[in-house]
From Swiss-Prot:
It comes from Edwardsiella ictaluri (strain 93-146). This is Modulator protein MzrA. Residues 1-17 are cytoplasmic. It is a single-pass membrane protein. The chain crosses the membrane at residues 18-38.
Amino acid sequence: MNQANSQPFTRRQGWKRILGLLLFIVAALTVVILPQLGHKEVSLQIRATHNGLATPDGFFVYQKLDENGVSITSITQDREGLVIRLAHPEQRTLALQVLQRELPPGYSIADKILHRSLFYKSERPAAATLSYSAGHNR
């Protein structure tokens, strides 16, 4: 009689453990996947506006942004120029001001927005009205 009563108790314990494990897996996946569903990165692209003008040195750009408190994720070269990915999108305006002040005339700085989701990645320049011509303002 004791064996008959202990079997249902063991089965209930097994189901509770399986249910607990499933809930843990769902919670862990939610924590990992949820931030990836709608991530937006703000980048700036520096391009030469004149033929023969070289792309600015990435280390120089990094140094100037860092000196002014702008945190960046990466600086990479692409076929059109230099792409600077900002660590904090709210620092975009400060980064633009620093680059406009530090770069010599002949460079264009444009916003580039990267939308990432779990299933889709889109990289496109922002509206043309957000393009700036760098150089010292006197």
